[in-house]
Amino acid sequence: IALIGTDHTEKESGLLSKLTDWEKMVPSKQFEYIDIIRRLISRHKISDEEKEEIIKSLGKRFPYQSTKINMAVAPLLIELDPSETVPKVIEFLKGDCSQREGIHYLFHLRNSTSGRSLESRKIFFRLLAKYETLLGGRGLPQALKAIRKESTATLTEREKAQLRTVLASRPALPAFPD
């Protein structure tokens, strides 16, 4: 709110200078900062230098010890620096993460084309198939279907052919009790 009415470059330089204070911030301030940076990027064109400053500051520490910070920072870094961030997120997904975290990351990875190897795409679609078998809220099946549709649309015909078995495989659902 305090930034309204200030010059665009003042906003950016003031906000970006906070990157040096990142480690000193309490988590609530880190979340506020991430949100402000995300809004700045979505509403204004920022220079390549400013993007690099954000990537350098937030990306060098990713993944963080905090799941919540990871979930807030990952979408921003996937957008700004997919070639470095996507492999880190895929590795994170291979580890022990909750269903909520996994679906969150799959959602944000769905449209990325940079930073994804054929192997990482296999991992992505295997995890997506796994989550498609889990019980969830009413909208979960539709959300996962949309993630599958959008992520499949990013594949080239060659990749679709190479991933044919992974794309077609769906783990069997457990039997419902009588």
Task: Please report, for each region that a protein language model flagged, where it lies by residue.
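Long, ordered, helix-rich scaffold segments
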Residues: 1-178
